[in-house]
UniProtKB/Swiss-Prot annotation:
PANTHER family: HYDROPHOBIN
Taxonomic classification: Eukaryota, Fungi, Dikarya, Ascomycota, Pezizomycotina
Protein name as it appears in the record: Class II hydrophobin FOXG_02746
Quaternary context: Homodimer. Homodimers further self-assemble to form highly ordered films at water-air interfaces through intermolecular interactions.
Induction or repression: Expression occurs during infection and is directly regulated by the transcription factor FTF2.
Organism: Fusarium oxysporum f. sp. lycopersici (strain 4287 / CBS 123668 / FGSC 9935 / NRRL 34936)
Amino acid sequence: MQFYTIVSLFLAGTAYALPATSANGYEACPSGGLFGNPQCCSLNLVGVLSGDCRAPTKTPNSAKEFQAICAESGQKARCCGLSEILELGAFCQKPVGVSA
């Protein structure tokens, strides 16, 4: 019985995405809050609700690079919560240092 409890806790702990931190220490979306998942989103409703979000193709080294990575696919850099559900970044905000 204890074995199943330990395995369940381990699997639950690994289900959370690790923050994408670059080699120089830049963290696109600081973890620990609602907006901890870096995403590239193409839909944006009223500045908070976003859709069609996907993880960046590589780990950005700066806010400017994060913006450029997303712009390559016609999307905008965002920090989102609930991004794993049907590719819908339900709650997103603009990362610090990103202009658009």
